């Protein structure tokens, strides 16, 4: 649905060339929720703005729905952009207009008949849970309600793609969760492809199918949410994952200088097995649990535990082999 091929974006600043995007290759399948995560200045916003041509790439190709935007005329680009909705960080609502008028704005701009506008806007306000706010104004709404209006407005033209630019970063955690659930409903009910950029790994963890990590204008790691969260490869990805799932041993434990420390990662059915008690029963090994966490990734239980194994080296070795046979990943700390 969305493809970047060798995309570059270069700005001139003080006589110097600044590469905001540097050789971006990325593919988002139709109906997917794809997250791009990175720190401030990594190139996230520039990347997403290339999809609706608010930014024109310096080099490379951007395909939306199979069409290369770089080869289209201005009129053709306008046609493609009508199938792309956008949700902004700070809502971008018109304060002088009612909620109904804000959602209706994209339809009014293309001279949609008034009866069709009323029907569509009413449907969308009902969908986002704000049907009773149609006559209100933006300053009468909470932040979460304003973002619901922004989502309804973005859906007004029946887009095939929805771009979300830090759509939850101005919201509190509870409201963030509500907005993410709404975006998931948008994806499922309307079969809309969502490209979402964020600096919050928890956002990607909650609703994305796949995620890419961007740093200094380059994609440094990408894959399914499960793969990136369970086995991050780069230091930047590890840092983001740590913010959502803390695998690290507390510093107070590290100071004890314990031996035979192992991090165990278990997935799916193995998450519910009492394998540690079995280790103690089968082998002359004591298990000291130092740290642990369990969460869900794409509906699959995923846990991590740091343990100290106490006993003779031979017994510890046999215990580790047993744990591996239970399909549990082991990493010596």
UniProtKB/Swiss-Prot annotation:
Recorded GO CC terms: plasma membrane
Family, as annotated: Belongs to the ABC transporter superfamily. Methionine importer (TC 3.A.1.24) family.
SUPFAM superfamilies according to UniProt: ACT-like, P-loop containing nucleoside triphosphate hydrolases
Membrane topology: Peripheral membrane protein
Residues of the ABC transporter domain: 2-241
Gene name, Swiss-Prot/TrEMBL: metN1
Protein name, entry field: Methionine import ATP-binding protein MetN 1
Lineage of the species this protein comes from: Bacteria, Bacillati, Bacillota, Bacilli, Bacillales
Domain of life: Bacteria
UniProt entry keywords in alphabetical sequence: Amino-acid transport, ATP-binding, Cell membrane, Membrane, Nucleotide-binding, Translocase, Transport
Primary subcellular site in the record, as a coarse category: membrane
Gene3D superfamilies given in the database record: 3.30.70.260, P-loop containing nucleotide triphosphate hydrolases
Catalysed reactions, as listed in the record: L-methionine(out) + ATP + H2O = L-methionine(in) + ADP + phosphate + H(+); D-methionine(out) + ATP + H2O = D-methionine(in) + ADP + phosphate + H(+)
Keyword Transmembrane in record: no
Role of this protein: Part of the ABC transporter complex MetNIQ involved in methionine import. Responsible for energy coupling to the transport system.
Keyword Cell membrane among record annotations: yes
Chain positions recorded as ATP binding sites: 38-45
GO molecular function annotations of the record: ABC-type D-methionine transporter activity; ATP binding; ATP hydrolysis activity
Subunit structure as annotated in this protein's UniProt entry: The complex is composed of two ATP-binding proteins (MetN), two transmembrane proteins (MetI) and a solute-binding protein (MetQ).
A Pfam family per the record: NIL
Enzyme Commission number(s) of this protein: 7.4.2.11
Subcellular location: Cell membrane
């Amino acid at each position: 649905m969305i493809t970047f091929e060798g995309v570059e974006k270069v700005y001139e600043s003080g006589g110097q060339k600044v590469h905001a995007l540097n050789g971006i290759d990325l593919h988002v399948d139709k109906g997917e929720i794809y997250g791009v995560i990175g720190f401030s200045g990594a190139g996230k916003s520039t990347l997403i703005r290339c999809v609706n041509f608010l930014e024109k790439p310096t080099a490379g190709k951007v395909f939306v729905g199979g069409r290369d935007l770089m080869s289209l005329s201005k009129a053709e680009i306008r046609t493609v952009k009508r199938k792309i909705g956008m949700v902004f960080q700070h809502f971008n609502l018109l304060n002088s207009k009612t909620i109904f008028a804000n959602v209706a704005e994209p339809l009014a701009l293309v001279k949609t008949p008034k009866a069709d506008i009323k029907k569509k806007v009413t449907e969308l306000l009902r969908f986002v849970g704000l049907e009773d706010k149609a006559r209100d104004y933006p300053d009468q709404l909470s932040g979460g309600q304003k973002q619901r209006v922004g989502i309804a407005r973005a859906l007004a033209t029946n887009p095939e793609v929805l771009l979300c630019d830090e759509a939850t970063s101005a919201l509190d955690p509870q409201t963030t969760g509500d907005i993410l659930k709404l975006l998931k409903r948008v994806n499922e009910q309307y079969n809309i492809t969502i490209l979402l950029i964020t600096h919050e790994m928890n956002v990607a963890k909650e609703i994305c199918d796949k995620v890419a990590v961007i740093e200094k204008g380059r994609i440094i790691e990408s894959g399914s949410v499960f793969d990136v969260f369970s086995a991050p490869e780069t230091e930047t990805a590890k840092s983001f994952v740590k913010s959502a799932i803390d695998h690290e041993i507390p510093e107070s434990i590290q100071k004890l200088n314990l031996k035979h420390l192992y991090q165990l990662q278990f997935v799916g059915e193995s998450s519910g097995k009492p394998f540690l008690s079995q280790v103690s029963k089968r082998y002359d090994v004591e298990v000291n649990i130092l740290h642990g966490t369990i969460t869900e990734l794409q509906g699959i239980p995923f846990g991590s535990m740091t343990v100290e194994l106490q006993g003779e080296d031979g017994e510890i070795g046999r215990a580790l082999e047993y744990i591996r046979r239970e399909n549990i990943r082991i990493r010596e700390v």
